[in-house]
Amino acid sequence: ISYSGEVADCGEVSLRRLSMRIDLLNKAEGLTITKVTFRNRAVKSRLFTPNAMLAEPGAVEDKEYPDLNLVGSFDVPAEYKSKIYGYENLSRRGEATVPTLDIEYTYLDQPYTHTVEFLDRNDPEGLAPLALKRNYLYRITVGRKVEPEFGIEVVDWTNEKSFNVDDITF
């Protein structure tokens, strides 16, 4: 309804989430994830898609997800889904707000910490941070052939279909 009271059909309205999500899957036998810390988790956003990271105080925080007990199993992976959220993080290389995920785990009864860096595979040097975009799910799978391996998969949040990062509009 307009200001003058006239009714008009504006067509379909497509809504998108303002947040992004990170899920963990542990397929590594003998490895137990005990804690996750999301470093530089964006806690503020804009209604419209920004072109750069918010540069105001309090835009990011470190958030801990303690007391996890994700026991690895190849046949039935331990999942930590729909618990880690944040807003877009468009930080560029060298900025203090580049996001990472510290995964604390035990492997063969020894404690370890692995830092997952979200890096753009299309960057020739492999050093450019991957923009964590709204409305996407970032799935981190922990596996093991000989040593523990950490892989990142970016999928559509709604239908969980894979796509190329090139397809994300910036």
Regions found by a protein language model. Give the residues of each.
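Extracellular low-complexity, Gly/Ser/Thr-rich intrinsically disordered linkers
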Residues: L137-R139
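Long, acidic/polar, low-complexity amphipathic helices and coiled-coil-like
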Residues: I1-D23
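Intrinsically disordered, low-complexity repeat and linker tracts
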Residues: T141-F170
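Tryptophan-paired
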Residues: E12, R21-R134, N159, D167-F170
